[in-house]
Amino acid sequence: MRKSSSPSLSNCNSVLANKIFGIPLDELQQGGHPDNEVPFIVRHVVDYIEEHGGLEQQGLFQVNGNAETVEWLRQRYDSGEEVDLVKEADVPSAISLLRFFLQELPEPVIPGSLHIHLMQLSQDYNNEDEFGRKLRFLLQQLPPVNYSLLKFLCRFLANVASHHEEIWSANSLAAVFGPDVFHIYTDVEDMKEQEIVSRIMAGLLENYYEFFENEEEDFSSNDLSSITEQVNELSEEEEEDEKLEHIEELPEEGAEKSNDMPEVVQLRMTENILESNSVTATSTHISPISILPASTDILERTIRAAVEQHLFDLQSSIDHDLKNLQQQSVVCNNEAESIHCDGEGSNNQIDIADDIINASESNRDCSKPVASTNLDNEAMQQDCVFENEENTQSVGILLEPCSDRGDSEDGCLEREEYLLFDSDKLSHLILDSSSKICDLNANTESEVPGGQSVGVQGEAACVSIPHLDLKNVSDGDKWEEPFPAFKSWQEDSESGEAQLSPQAGRMNHHPLEEDCPPVLSHRSLDFGQSQRFLHDPEKLDSSSKALSFTRIRRSSFSSKDEKREDRTPYQLVKKLQKKIRQFEEQFERERNSKPSYSDIAANPKVLKWMTELTKLRKQIKDAKHKNSDGEFVPQTRPRSNTLPKSFGSSLDHEDEENEDEPKVIQKEKKPSKEATLELILKRLKEKRIERCLPEDIKKMTKDHLVEEKASLQKSLLYYESQHGRPVTKEERHIVKPLYDRYRLVKQMLTRASITPVLGSPSTKRRGQMLQPIIEGETAHFFEEIKEEEEDGVNLSSELGDMLKTAVQVQSSLENSESDVEENQEKLALDLRLSSSRAASMPELLEQLWKARAEKKKLRKTLREFEEAFYQQNGRNAQKEDRVPVLEEYREYKKIKAKLRLLEVLISKQDSSKSI
């Protein structure tokens, strides 16, 4: 078994002498091994894991290594010592060391600028093939060192996932290494971003050979030498094509151009970049070293953009730069009027070029040849003195006149797109003066200034264009929007992507001041030069719909429509409840559990919704409380969103004015409380007569009581809705008969539902329906108590006879007699308690003193028992431990109940006397 240390370890001591952790990747490469773009420590650790990892172990990549071992290994690598991972480390520590190296990089393997594009791409894509192409292109934008390291890591993890798929899937490995590659913190707030990163990383692992190893589709290279070779080849081809073009473009009057003119893909972009870099490198102000990285970046992007556009129309990073490119005015020479184009089929109409990368995705009009921006290098060199004072550029528009190729039925020709620009001036191409804008696509009158010259390439003759009269191009309404008839439209439609209709939007004239502001077309939003307008907002594409299509409404009837724009609190409550419900459903789908209050509080947006919902509910409750005087104000129906705001506004206002007068009249005619009470009593009496209910409550059955209770409840609610709940003493006195009757009915209904207990001394009392205690009146219980005493004596004799007969059957006469005596004593105690209510004050005081003395005696006995139990067992006595003194506890409870009864009776008889 060979050691995991690399054979080149002894030769890399000079590399390891410097610090490894926390050092950028480009510095590590420049430090000692420029040929090997993967850091040595990564290769060393990965080789060790592949040989001695035991990757079939469950949870190997999720187990953290020993912190002390990882720190010791880091110090060894930083100090330049030779490390033998087989003898000095274990697999979890090696994996933790690898992840620690990735985490300590100053810039992640996926830089922040590219990280944003990847996140946006992952959220916006709809097609898997398109997502794969764009992701592959974005990966090629990585620096060479980062690309090599990412490729090496993905190859290692893809091998692990393929050989141990049951244990380590691509998703699980992506969840472990994704945050390390992208530098994503695993906090709760970044859970969504972490999921996106894990999904991207899993896609890289599952489709590793498609993204990294497929040489047929890997058109661009990260090597500067290969880029230079490609640029040189393209520049040589361009020179040959240019010579042929100059020969065929010599001006001859009355001569028609040949139909066999070669169609050449123009890559003058790269040629001008090389020329501009060579010119700039000779300057004394800027050193060639500072230019090299920028030129390299532009070269890379240029090659990739041209190849991607030619092969599969993929949007590149130059798209962002071209969107900021503002076109200057179209210029022509004074010789333009002297040269005329022959042939009726030639159509010389100028249009500003659309984005070169998104040409296949936008609508192109075949009737207008595509113009291209020419930032001529020779013109730049001539005007360099003026550029130091004024930050301007000379822009030439390279125009190709369209001529008949012999086929008059084909109204459109295939055209080439030219884009020549200076790389050093790319960031300065911003239009400073709006007076130079010449809008030729909006079908308006336009003047072409003749004082400026057209920039040419080399010493070739400039093809002058005659002055175009565009005044009568769209005067008639019979003109229709032209649509492409060439192959590129068909190819785009066959690519599987959704295409806009060629007649998607009717072009409109420039709006007048008094007209309503229309919506800009999508094509005019990209480069800001020509403003196109659409008639119908329903025909806008997705990006144009982002603009608000608003129209200034006239206040047809009155200015009170603004008040109706506000949503009612009920609508806002429903909207917030819907948002919160959607959050809860999403949370439950993700975590299989309903969100708790802490989960809601952790999300500031949802917490804000909850706070607003609470405020709105409180507002609605306050509004209901304000309207509780008796008038139920009808809620205004919310206005339909589909109807115009002025629809029916005058009618609504007239209705409101008419409704105000009846409200005032109703308030003036509101009946008094006494009249309302009389009306309620009259209605109750009529209902009792209709349902044949007795007037006396005592004669009512249980069903009658239920009906009476419901009627009283409705009556009381009606009274409270008219006058509110009675609060003051006068208000309660007025409605007191109604409330007393309701309480009595409720009490009798409750008593009627209780089943009486047979054999109990208080059976008669429980079965009887108690009269309500009326405030300020003395309640008389003497007759009931006497009846209970007589019943108690009879009951005791009956119980005695029954017990005697039962004891005779059991042949235990003595025990039966003792039981009878005990029962009689208990009954006597109950009788004394009942008779104490009719006793005088001295008798009550005497019973009170005796009860207190007996209570004191029992409490002393129980306390002694509890203390002895505590000393014996070391704990307090529980309920099951009180069996020896159970009778004392029962007596103690009875004495306490008797004391409470005596104190109440004494306080009722004479509350002024102190006990």
UniProtKB/Swiss-Prot annotation:
- Which residue stretches does the UniProt record annotate as biased composition, category Basic and acidic residues? 661-671
Print the keywords alphabetically. GTPase activation
> Which segments cross the bilayer?
none
A Gene Ontology biological process annotation? signal transduction
What SUPFAM superfamilies does the annotation carry?
A: GTPase activation domain, GAP (SSF48350)
Name all Rho-GAP domain ranges: 23-212
Q: Name one Pfam family in it.
A: RhoGAP
Q: Where is the composition biased (Polar residues)?
A: 637-649
Tell me the protein family, please: Belongs to the FAM13 family.
Q: What is this protein called?
A: Protein FAM13B
Upper classification of the source organism reads: Eukaryota, Metazoa, Chordata, Craniata, Vertebrata
